[in-house]
């Protein structure tokens, strides 16, 4: 949002000095309206004078030049000019005398053009950066005094424009009046001097109402509509002050009528629209939803197919505007317009937002309507100001008007407790200052008691809905810098109640799984009994914990996390074909094996605990590649390794036919283990779901889904999470292709390489070493070129030194020795291992 400093000062009625642009920027930023930049305009224009043409003759040596006799208020000068729109003798122009420097950097000096001296320059608005028209010179009004400085006659020529970053909850700050209101309230409360707004009066010439002028057929989408029929309009270019003001704010001047509506947009934040009433069938408008297959050509020349949910402004026959977004070409104001219907309305923000997005049409009007404009006195004030300017600049007069209301939002009443404000802010805002702040923001305060203020919110502040919003307003204007610094540490430090070890372990594991690209779900702990029967080999039916009052057939506490994850997989695959990567952290429940009470109990356990269901905290992971693609269990074990690393554990994989689980494919499952002082500890399993389980959940036959689970209680405690310094020098990598029997797990191949690297003798002060944690399995190939019963593993190994970069001459012999030693070790268990 661009705010003109000069215009803002015109809107402020201050007893004290006017804030400088820098001071104003500091005030606004402190109020939450962050000033992102200051743009200064008019440098060099201070030297521009009002020149009067005393005579003009054709240049004797150049057909396109005119020799002008120009009076600058003190002397008559000769100036050569090539413009074709020179005014007649007596006309006024913008004159740059010798020595002036234009905004673009051009310095005016005496020149001789084809033998005729030129003692200055007659300027265009483009050369003065007052507009974009560079085809002709800038012609000034005849009433401007000759010899006067131009910037003293036209407000805004020398100006500073503040660029604000307005947050979406402050639609009132999308106009100069709203920003000026904040500044006035701030100055009144902080300085104690009188500060108020200068606003145009709410009056209009006596004119009869015509209720047929406007009809609202969609009252839930249009809360208020003011329509004014204006006649005797003369469309012409806007005066210089209006053109300059719009140009400084980034808008292109078009004509007096259109420019007036744009000026009101920037002044009040209220969009207005002018229809050519002569082009409206019946001379009236209807606010309605678009008809089926109705179309509209908007002002940008685009033919748009309207949706039945679009709100339109129509005449007796067709849609004439997309309400709150853009007008229609068929009723636009043109040079021949003599009758106008002026619209000032409040539309429901949600509908305008939907239409703007549906048609990919964002405008200054829709930007404000989407956030909520004033439907109260601000709407009337913008309309009255526009009517006054139309009468002044275009000669128009109002012959009829109408006000129609639909479902208009009510004014909110909020109870404010000063004691509550002091408690939340940590500082008590003095009563007088608080009342002054609220009054400056036009919030009506009715004191029902010393600690109970009933506040009526103005219609221009839709963001004020709760007591804390009013407290926030008090803090904005009282100032964060007024909050005293307080030593908040308690005198007697007490130890904080920390989370238990299992909770911390679960949180870290969940963080690691999220970092690995998995999404966490939370499913119900109650499931249908028939779903748990698929896991009866692990937890038999007699250990099910049944619920006394089951809901929707879910009468058993879950013994496994997999049913909830599979339900989520079915739900997602039925709606999209994208990959599904899920995990859940939760408890499972089962009765203990046997009901005998032991003679002794572990420390911290009560005797009654053995008669309660056993609870295990588990982590379940499920990966599906999307569509009919197959998930790779290795991607799952990689995610597990990354997550366990956050807990300080290194993952080990081991396979075998003993201790297999029935819900995983018997040929594609491994045990998950972590290192401990006593050796590897099994903490879970991973692999591919059994085809029978895929069929039981109605998933496509042949679909391969990876699943893994971790028992958090089985993880050994780690007091210190392992960490190391990030290497300062890059490692170098070597790719290794090994031909191995299919039965030999890749984990054993990596372990052999790791052992070979550790056994490699070191040489020198900073030897090259194999990075044990950096080995990767890039590819598992089975097919042409590989003997039957074997596969080709493509591995990547990384080598580095602690304090320097390494060279190929160092790495190559090291790599060859490690590969040879690892292959020898592997051949003892699986003959046929060889590099490719």
Where are the language model's segments positioned?
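A carboxyl-terminal module marker
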Residues: 23, 440-447, 627-836
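Phosphate-backbone binding interfaces of nucleic-acid-interacting proteins
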Residues: 1-205, 341, 357-362, 368, ...
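Mobile "lid/hinge" segments at catalytic clefts and subdomain interfaces of large enzymes
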Residues: 114-128, 133-139, 143, 150-160, ...
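Extended, well-folded interaction surfaces typified by the phenylalanyl-tRNA synthetase beta subunit core
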Residues: 414-580, 798-800, 805-806, 810-836
